[in-house]
Amino acid sequence: MGKKRIYELAKELNVPSKQLIAQAQQLGFSVKNHMSTLGDSEARQLQGTTTVTHPKSQPAPAKTSRATQAVAKNVTRTANQQQSNSRHQQSGDYLNNNRNNNQNNSQSRNSNGNRSNNGGNRTNSNNGNRSANASRSNSARNNGGSNTNRSNNNNNNNRSNNNNRSNTSNNRTNSTGNRTNNGGQNRNNNRTTTNNNNNNSNRSNGSNNSSRNGSGRFGGSLNSNNNGGGRYRGGNNNNRRRNNRNNKSRNNKNQRIRQVNNKPAPVRKDKPLPETLVYTVGMNAQDLGKLLHREPAEIIKKLFMLGVAVNQNQSLDKDTIEILATDYGINAQEKVQVDVTDLDKFFDDEVNNTDNLAPRAPVVTVMGHVDHGKTTLLDQLRHTHVTEGEAGGITQAIGAYQVKHDGKVITFLDTPGHAAFTEMRARGADITDITVLVVAADDGVMPQTIEAINHAKAAKVPIIVAVNKIDKPGANPNHVMEQLTEYGLIPEDWGGDTIFVQISAKFGKNLDELLDMILLQSEVLELTANPKQNAAGSVLEASLDRGKGSTATLLVQQGTMHVGDPIVVGNTYGKVRTMTNDHGKRIKEAVPSTPIEITGLNDVPDAGDRFVVFDDEKTARDAGEQRAKQALMEERKQTAHVTLDNLFDSMKQGELKEVDVIIKADVQGSVEALAGSLRKIDVEGVRVNIIHTAVGAINESDVALAEASNAIIIGFNVRPTPQAKAQADTDDVDIRLHQVIYNAIDEIESAMKGMLEPTYKEEITGQAEIREIYKVSKIGTIGGGMVTDGVIHRDSGVRVIRDGVVIYDGKLASLRRFKDDVKEVKQGFELGLRIEDYNDIKVNDVIEAYVMKEVPVE
């Protein structure tokens, strides 16, 4: 027999493959899935242990008994039908066309019943099919070739044949054995099948006799009685049933539609009215409908009944809204409008909030003169090398850092010490808690030291003096203390209240003592903040990054800032996209006293601006846009308009020469410092006109603006893009790049001085006395004389002096010695000269020669 797969054996046994696999594995066979193969012995062993499950069906004997009863009932009907057929054959006028339309249906039903039985029933099914074929042949013999048996149900016959073909090999064996039955048995089976078919036909379709006229097989007239209904010819009852079903379904559908249409519309449940209508003047019907939970049409109708005709978009005044609220029977309360553009009010409210206060880190600003060691001090505290990256060792912007000491955090702000950065130092003093004043022990008190003291006193901030560079040979800390007493900073050792710490930032000496003093001072101040409210603070610095866009260094003074917060910074707004701490790491939130760098603003804010976090993005956007409009209006107001009052001043300014300048810098603070310093340059007759300032690299737009306005571009810590550089070379635009601010200031000052009209000073070079005159026709009067003093030059100016009075001032037309033209004649030599356009020369006139020399601008 060979090997057999699991799914084949499962099909023969009529059991699921999973069940067969489980039983095979229990018997120890190596079976994995339904495609595994079994030997003959294994298959027989598995068949012996498998319980065959049959589908639910009625037992075969019941089917057989019903078929037998059907045969007994239809014997009489079959005999009558055969007699009728014989009468039609004798007359020859009609051709009897007996169609057993439902024969195959009966066979298919028998076949279906037999399929559910075991081997014996399958044999009967096959015998029944053969007997049906035999009945067709017998019927053909009885009709004598005149009657034609047509099978109208070929499809059913095909299905029954297909079912018979799909039997298993056992069925084929049984049917083969049944083919050896004798003819008598076949004829009996044929009769049974025929009667059964007739019975089924009569039972399903009834006795339906119909006459049909048409052409017969040989062209004659054909009258046939159709007993029983087939698929095509006896289907009147079937059509009637089908029509009835269609009518019923159509009626049911129409009835359902009527029921749906007849349903009453659902009653809309209105939300209850609010107890108080909180409104703002200028609301329309749509806005009021949302507040009152009513449709705008209802609001408009009510107002119309009250004598007010409006549409849903028309703004309503205060009286109309209050009348509407009274008609609804509720109170009306006008909402107080908060000016979202007033950031100072929001900032003060957030700062003055005393709920949920918690200790915060102190903010310390380091101030002092240039090169007194401020950045070096922070360098030692942070263990980094910031100074090496600064241009010329000068801090150009505020640096914000955090240092941990004894488990506590201190925030340091490093401010520039150069004179140009006054505004940046003032900002640092305003946002700080403690000021550390760094004074070099060898230099003592310098101008920016005094300025830092004044800033700290104006901000009412305590000062800790750090006397630096005590390691230098010429250091004199006591002299520094004596100098500072003149400005009210008296050391504690001398009976004052100012803390002095002598340090060496270069070698890290006494730095721990300085940090201890800072923490002690912060404990005295009792610094607290509310971390649970919206964040508020100040802008330390702002810049435009090519990859990040607008960036701003902020100091959070109140609340906690999170990534994604809607924020208004000065005249700009945005949503916090990223936050970076002083170590360059991204963070998700920032608590009070934390310096951070954020991105996500729509523009670059100004250094020193305040920022406030809003509850929603829409309010933040509205506030930012309104503040930007207000700033633009203020800028336009500052544009000077010529009136009769300022006409003379405008005329005087028109006489002044201007140096047009475009300033581009890396950060906003540097832009402010450079612009302020250039405006302070005092050169008589020339002034600086700054036409544009911005942060970021020098681009093509800057070059185009400079070319149109004939301006100079000053780049501070920035460089032009390659496209801008090429365009500047083409358009002959002057771009000056600097890294140290006072170099830029000196260069602009020199350019301004060079624009002045040159100043000339008269210098007398010599004198000559006229002793003889010669009048020559067509030439004029020639004077001959002697050089009595200095040198007479050919290109010098001359004056004719007679009796101490200047008679004429002009130029020499010619200068000769004897007959030769010469360039100059020195003292003690004779000369001959002719004055241009002047012939009234007389003896004893004095000719004074002079030149105009340019005086350099001081």
Swiss-Prot record:
Predominant cellular place of this UniProt entry's protein: cytoplasm
Protein name, as recorded: Translation initiation factor IF-2
Ranges of biased composition (kind: Low complexity): 80-226
Positions of the UniProt region annotated as G3: 414-417
Native organism: Lactiplantibacillus plantarum (strain ATCC BAA-793 / NCIMB 8826 / WCFS1)
Lineage: Bacteria, Bacillati, Bacillota, Bacilli, Lactobacillales
Family annotation (Pfam families): EF-G_D2 (PF22042), GTP_EFTU (PF00009), IF-2 (PF11987), IF2_N (PF04760)
Disordered: annotated segments: 49-271
PANTHER family listed in its UniProt record: TR-TYPE G DOMAIN-CONTAINING PROTEIN, TRANSLATION INITIATION FACTOR IF-2-RELATED
